[in-house]
UniProtKB/Swiss-Prot annotation:
This is NADP-specific glutamate dehydrogenase. The keyword NADP applies. The lineage of its organism: Bacteria, Pseudomonadati, Pseudomonadota, Gammaproteobacteria, Enterobacterales. PROSITE patterns: GLFV_DEHYDROGENASE. It catalyses: L-glutamate + NADP(+) + H2O = 2-oxoglutarate + NH4(+) + NADPH + H(+). It comes from Salmonella typhimurium (strain LT2 / SGSC1412 / ATCC 700720).
Length: 447
C-alpha cells in the first residue's frame, strides 16, 4: 500500500483481506487508531510495508484432530496454531479449547500477544493456538486422548527456540501436562516446550497466580499514579476461573472489598465482600466438573443474578476477567453512572471499542489487557528462563520479578501515554509494544 494512505484506507485493506474475521479486524482497528498519530509523526515506521507485514501472521497452521470418545466413537475437531510474529523471540502464546474458537479469534489473540510480549521486555514473539474442542463435560480420558491426538500434528511446529505454547481458556495444568507429555514422547526430547507445566516436570511457582496477581499489581500502580489505591475500594470481578480467582485474592490482600464473581450462567453478589475462606470455597466449587457460581451463591445465601454480568453493581473498580467483548457500551454507561473510577482488563479484549472510548471520554482510568494481563506471559518467560538454566526459583523471587515487570510495563505505558494529568494507557501500551516490535522488524530487513 501507499505509505501516505489514510487510517481508514489501511483498515479497509485489512477488512477486505479477511471480511469475515470480525474479532481480528476489531483488534487491528483498536491498535491502529491509537497508533496512527504516532506513525504520522514518525514516518520511518511506514517504510518497507511494515504495517502490512505487522498485521499478517508469519504462519498459520490448520489441521484436523481425530480422537475416540468414551463410547469408542470417532470425533473430529479443528485446531490451529497462529505463529504471528517472531521478530523479538520465539512465538509465545496460549492454547485455547472452546467451541467458539476460530481463526479470527486466534489471529486477534496472536496479534495482541505480539505487543503484550514486547511490553514485558522479555525476548518473546507472539502466537496463539487452540481448537473448537469443548473440555466441559468430557471425562479425563477423553481430554487426554484429544490432547494426545492434537499433538501428533502440532509437535512438529514447536520447540524451545521456535514456538512455546501455554494454557488459556479450557486449557489448564492438566491439559498442558497431557500435551507436554505427548510432545516429549513424539520428539524424543525432554525439553518440555510448554509453559504452565506442573511443578514436578519443570513448572514455575507463581505461574498459576501470575495473570491475576499481575493485573492487580498494574492496576495498583495506575491508581497510585492518580492518587488512589485498592485500599477500601469496592471491586467487581467478572469470571470465576484462574485469572478471576487470583485477582480476587490479590485485591483482597491490597485491602479491597471484592463483591462479585461470575460465569456464563450469571453473577454472584456478596455485599460484605469475599474473604479468604469464601474464595477457597469458590475455587473448590469451580474445580469440580460442573461447578457453577450459582452453587456458591446458594451455599452462602448470597444474591445471584441469573443470566446477568456484574456491571450493574455499583463499584469503584471493575476487573473484567472472563472473555472478549463481555463489557459493552451499555454496561460501560451503567458503570460510569455508578461512579466507577478504574477499569482494568484481566481477559483479552473484554471491553468493546465503543465501551473503551466511553471510559476514556468520561475520564475513567482504563488499563488495556495487553498491559494489565501481561503477568501470565511474563511469568511464562521466567519459567522458560528457569528451564533453560535447569533451575527452580523460590516463589518470593518469581513474585518479585513479576511485580517488577508489571511496574516496568506501567512505566512504558506512562512514557507513551500522553499528558501527565491523565495517562491514556491504551495509547501508551499500543505505542510502547509497537515500537519494540517495529524496531526489531526494521533492523532485520524485509523478511
Amino acid at each position: 500500500m501507499d505509505q501516505t494512505c489514510s487510517l481508514e484506507s489501511f483498515l479497509n485493506h485489512v477488512q477486505k483481506r479477511d471480511p469475515h474475521q470480525t474479532e481480528f479486524a476489531q483488534a487491528v482497528r483498536e491498535v491502529m487508531t491509537t497508533l496512527w498519530p504516532f506513525l504520522e509523526q514518525n514516518p520511518r515506521y511506514r517504510h518497507m510495508s511494515l504495517l502490512e507485514r505487522l498485521v499478517e501472521p508469519e504462519r498459520v497452521i490448520q489441521f484436523r484432530v481425530v480422537w475416540l470418545d468414551d463410547k469408542n466413537q470417532v470425533q473430529v475437531n479443528r485446531a490451529w496454531r497462529v505463529q504471528f510474529n517472531s521478530a523479538i523471540g520465539p512465538y509465545k502464546g496460549g492454547m485455547r479449547f472452546h467451541p467458539s474458537v476460530n481463526l479470527s479469534i486466534l489471529k486477534f489473540l496472536g496479534f495482541e500477544q505480539t505487543f503484550k510480549n514486547a511490553l514485558t521486555t522479555l525476548p518473546m514473539g507472539g502466537g496463539k493456538g487452540g481448537s473448537d474442542f469443548d473440555p466441559k463435560g468430557k471425562s479425563e480420558g477423553e481430554v487426554m486422548r484429544f490432547c494426545q491426538a492434537l499433538m501428533t500434528e502440532l509437535y512438529r511446529h514447536l520447540g524451545p527456540d521456535t514456538d512455546v505454547p501455554a494454557g488459556d481458556i479450557g486449557v489448564g495444568g492438566r491439559e498442558v501436562g497431557f500435551m507436554a507429555g505427548m510432545m516429549r514422547k513424539l520428539s524424543n526430547n525432554s525439553s518440555c516446550v510448554f509453559t504452565g507445566k506442573g511443578l514436578s516436570f519443570g513448572g514455575s511457582l507463581i505461574r498459576p497466580e501470575a495473570t491475576g496477581y499481575g493485573l492487580v499489581y498494574f492496576t495498583e500502580a495506575m491508581l497510585k499514579r492518580h492518587g488512589l489505591g485498592f485500599e477500601g475500594m469496592r471491586v467487581a470481578v467478572s469470571g470465576s476461573g484462574n485469572v478471576a480467582q487470583y485477582a480476587i485474592e490479590k485485591a483482597m490482600a491490597f485491602g479491597a472489598r471484592v463483591v462479585t464473581a461470575s460465569d456464563s450462567s450469571g453473577t454472584v453478589v456478596d455485599e460484605s465482600g469475599f474473604t479468604p475462606e469464601k474464595l477457597a470455597r469458590l475455587c473448590e466449587i469451580k474445580a469440580s466438573r460442573d461447578g457453577r457460581v450459582a452453587d456458591y451463591a446458594r451455599e452462602f445465601g448470597l444474591t445471584y443474578l441469573e443470566g446477568q454480568q456484574p456491571w450493574s453493581v455499583p463499584v469503584d473498580i471493575a476487573l473484567p476477567c472472563a472473555t472478549q467483548n463481555e463489557l459493552d457500551v451499555d454496561a460501560a454507561r451503567v458503570l460510569i453512572a455508578n461512579g466507577v473510577k478504574a477499569v482494568a482488563e484481566g481477559a483479552n479484549m473484554p471491553t468493546t471499542i465503543e465501551a473503551t472510548d466511553l471510559f476514556l471520554e468520561a475520564g475513567v482510568l482504563f488499563a488495556p489487557g495487553k498491559a494489565a494481563n501481561a503477568g501470565g506471559v511474563a511469568t511464562s518467560g521466567l519459567e522458560m528462563a528457569q528451564n533453560a538454566a535447569r533451575l527452580s526459583w523460590k516463589a518470593e523471587k518469581v513474585d518479585a520479578r513479576l511485580h517488577h515487570i508489571m511496574l516496568d510495563i506501567h512505566h512504558a505505558c506512562v512514557e507513551y501515554g500522553g499528558d501527565n494529568k491523565h495517562t491514556n494507557y491504551v495509547q501508551g501500551a499500543n505505542i510502547a509494544g509497537f515500537v519494540k516490535v517495529a524496531d526489531a522488524m526494521l533492523a532485520q530487513g524485509v523478511i
